[in-house]
Design a protein with these regions (language model features):
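A short Gly-Trp-Pro
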Residues: 1-125
């Protein structure tokens, strides 16, 4: 099974081979500021990810151990990349078709915005 996706303008595209891991929803202040709200993503082993349009992919070093990838044309936030790890997180909203996954965890909930509640019954950390 291959999952495909892209940024809003299509300048950056990607393919993931195989099944996707269940996504989590990050409520940290960095993800909220970059995405505009919570950020749902799935962790994918690097060797199963192919990115096209890398010349349009910009990286922002958001902390000493993590960089965030976004399209330099449309600004879509696509990737959360801890280079020392064997996986990279991909934005769930960037996939072209339904993924068949279900949210399995809310993370950094202590940092969540005060304008919403989490009431879906999914575990929180």
């Amino acid at each position: 099974m291959t999952h495909t996706g892209s940024c809003l303008c299509g300048a950056v595209t990607f393919e993931v081979e195989g099944e996707l891991n269940p996504p989590d929803a990050c409520h940290c202040s960095q993800c909220r500021k970059q995405s505009g709200h919570i950020w749902a993503s799935t962790d994918v082993p690097r060797d199963r990810l192919t990115i096209a349009g890398e010349d349009r992919l910009s990286w922002y070093q958001s902390s000493p151990k993590v960089r965030r990838g976004f399209c330099s044309v449309c600004g879509s936030f696509l990737f959360w990349d801890p280079p020392a790890r064997g996986s990279i997180a991909i934005d769930m909203g960037a996939f072209d078709a339904p993924t068949g996954t279900h949210l399995h965890l809310h993370i950094f909930t202590a940092d969540k915005g005060d304008y919403y509640e989490i009431g879906d019954g999914v575990p929180q950390k």
